[in-house]
């Protein structure tokens, strides 16, 4: 069974026991969280349920396995001939989740 969930303004296709990295979610390591904004749910051999915009009664349960930071991204701005240069770096904080269960009532 698979589902398409909405987390942090992005969409992720998840299966049971899959591991995904999403934007930081506050919580302790090992704690369980539930996603209720499920955009689509289905099985590979059967027709899927597509939400309008979400599937009612569908829940994805996940466990927080790690809190980490992504690779550094360099932002560089320059205006030619004006001696204008700005350099900044950014590291996005991420949460690693293990999908435990996908249910639809």
From Swiss-Prot:
MF terms in GO: rRNA binding; structural constituent of ribosome
Highest taxon, organism lineage: Bacteria
Gene Ontology CC annotations of this record: cytoplasm; ribonucleoprotein complex; ribosome
A GO BP entry: translation
Keyword set includes RNA-binding: yes
Tagged with keyword Ribosomal protein: yes
Stored InterPro entries: bL21-like, bL21-like_sf, Ribosomal_bL21, Ribosomal_bL21_CS
Keywords: Ribonucleoprotein, Ribosomal protein, RNA-binding, rRNA-binding
Function summary: This protein binds to 23S rRNA in the presence of protein L20.
Cross-referenced PANTHER family: 50S RIBOSOMAL PROTEIN L21, LARGE RIBOSOMAL SUBUNIT PROTEIN BL21M
Subunit structure and binding partners: Part of the 50S ribosomal subunit. Contacts protein L20.
Protein known as: Large ribosomal subunit protein bL21
Organism: Rickettsia canadensis (strain McKiel)
Gene: rplU
């Amino acid at each position: 069974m698979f589902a398409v969930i909405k987390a942090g303004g992005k969409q992720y296709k998840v299966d049971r026991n899959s591991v995904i990295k999403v934007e930081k979610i506050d919580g302790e390591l090992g704690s369980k969280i539930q996603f209720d904004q499920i955009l689509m749910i289905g099985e590979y051999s059967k027709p899927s349920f597509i939400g309008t915009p979400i599937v009612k009664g569908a829940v994805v349960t996940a466990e927080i396995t790690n809190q980490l930071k992504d690779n550094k991204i360099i932002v560089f701005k320059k205006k030619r001939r004006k001696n204008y240069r700005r350099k900044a770096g950014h590291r996005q904080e991420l949460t690693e989740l293990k999908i435990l269960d996908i249910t639809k009532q």
